[in-house]
Amino acid sequence: RQMCIRDRIHSASNFVVGMAGAKAAIALGIKSIYEIRGFWHLTQSTKRIGYEKSDHYTLSERLEIETAKMSDHVFTITSALRDILIQEGVHEDKISVLPNAVDPKKFTIKKKDKNLEKQLNFKDKVVIGYIGSFVKYEGLDILLEACSLLHTKIGDMFRLLLVGDGDTMTTLRDATRLLQLEDIVTFTGRVNHDEVNKYYSLIDIAPLPRKGLRVCELVSPLKPFEAMASGKVLVTSSVKALAEIVEDGETGLVFEKDNPKDLANKLESVILDKSLRDTIGKNARKWVVENHSWDLVSKKVI
């Protein structure tokens, strides 16, 4: 029988998996790597009122830190998450940032789908678009408020395309009616996976208005990298996990988190200036291709 020799165990969050991997590595006398893609308890705190004050939340955080300390090396998804580990006593020399990335061959600058553009009556409009889950921490209510301010100021120059579904859908639809934005906002609901690219092609500006919650400060989604690779103008809130991705004014725009007025101002600047939109979109794609393809990021692990 041929035996396959392993020299390390690589485990991904959360601590339930990571601690098992670290202990197994110790028992076998080999190295362990713990990859922290997020803190489960932080996500739960956005869904369960009062959870962040519970013993389970406190224990989960402590066990995440202990797992990182036990492991020989730790990868974190953001610099902000790395900084938290260092503050909690994990030695900085054994932590590397392993960020999200994108396949730049899959996400490219595409021509707009003219049939869908006509169907949605988006012709000659600048399209602000979000594709993803409708959950509280994404801040889509802030986006609606910003679009209301924007519409009052610049009129009928843009449309807001919201593709997806989730817990806040009803609240967002109600807010749209209350703000009298029915002619501006299009809700598609959930769409088939093979149709997503058609909707994505219509988007000029991709806002990520995540709220100033701890989970948003520490964890980055895939969405910003996909938007940048596609040549969209990324407009993110100033939460650390997103702001560290963008060079403000060059590869995207950053607005003050939880501030719809500042978001409206940033959106206005790129709606009114096509040249600026084009420049930022091209810069964003170039930066992602040169720094955040999966091929490049995976070499840090290998």
Segments (PLM) and residue ranges:
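A short, well-ordered alpha-helix in the C-terminal region of glycosyltransferases
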Residues: 125, 184, 262, 269, ...
